[in-house]
Amino acid sequence: MTLRKLGAMVLAAVLAAGLLPAGALAARNEKMDADQMDIPAIIEAKDAEGTVNVYHWWTAGGEKDAIESVVDGFSNTYPNIRAKSNAIPGGAGGAMVMKVKVLQQAGKSPETFQAHPGQEIEPYLTSGLLLNLNQVWDYASIGTRALPGLEDLCTASDGNKYIVPIGIHKSNVIFYNIHVFEKYGVEIPDHENITWDEFWSICDQLAAAMPDGEYPIDLGDRKGWPACQVFEDIMMGTDPQIYEDFINGNYNVEDVTNVLSTYSRLMEYVAPDHSSRDWYETSGQLVA
């Protein structure tokens, strides 16, 4: 089953049986019991009518294409339902979260909206407006197909699932262009768990071989959050406990200073105009 088909099924499920005054991930200020609904029958009802709003923050490049593919898949499967893609730009969804909260308070909760798995969904539970998607998980056998640990992340504190995975976002990954290594005669390590010394050696070799205007590492952090994620990744890669202590205000100055030193050294290899570009612009340059 493709993500496009799964996305269409999810939107159908949250539409909740021919559009009750608005069944969905965020039912319009009306409490509903998803366990009493026949979600498989809802998914199979290809002649259902109505409108479903999809609020999200995927507005750039490939991510925009991805969400549009999901919405198009829904529209093709349920031609009598109008699917509206409502893009709210803003790094990592911050602006969209505020928009959803405003709509909820105004009694106009969207039928479905994007969210990260994990703790991000918890604040919405206090409103009692979320429709659980347990039956969707069962119907599509998502648990058996998801990456290890993902089902737990998508399970809320009350034991229900209010979110399904549509994409995969993973941090702490460095992408490299093999053609650049070949062009400048730098050997690509043939093993995992590369040490920092090995990484610095690679950066030094590339820096020495590259002409002016080219740099071993690139980063597009015009909106700030990519740089924050790099810092977090370095901290967690150094020692997960340092990260836990840091976010809980119990950090050790020496530990954090060492992390900052590593971060500072990494940035020495980054193109100086990194803060003028967005992440997707830099990604495009990497694969160009």
Task: Enumerate the predicted regions with their spans.
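Short, solvent-exposed loop/beta-turn-alpha elements that line the ligand-binding surface or hinge
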Residues: 42-45, 132-152, 191-192, 217, ...
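Extracytoplasmic/periplasmic solute-binding protein
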Residues: 157-167, 172, 198-248
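Extracytoplasmic "Venus flytrap"/periplasmic binding protein-like
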Residues: 73-149, 153, 182-185
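Short, polar/charged alpha-helical segment
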Residues: 37-44, 60-82
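Short, low-complexity disordered leader/linker segments with a strong preference
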Residues: 1-53, 76
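Short, well-ordered beta-strand elements
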Residues: 48-60, 81-86, 112, 162, ...
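Glycine-centered hinge/linker elements that transmit conformational signals in sensory
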Residues: 201-205, 246-278
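Hinge/lid segment of periplasmic solute-binding proteins
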Residues: 26-46, 116-172, 228-232
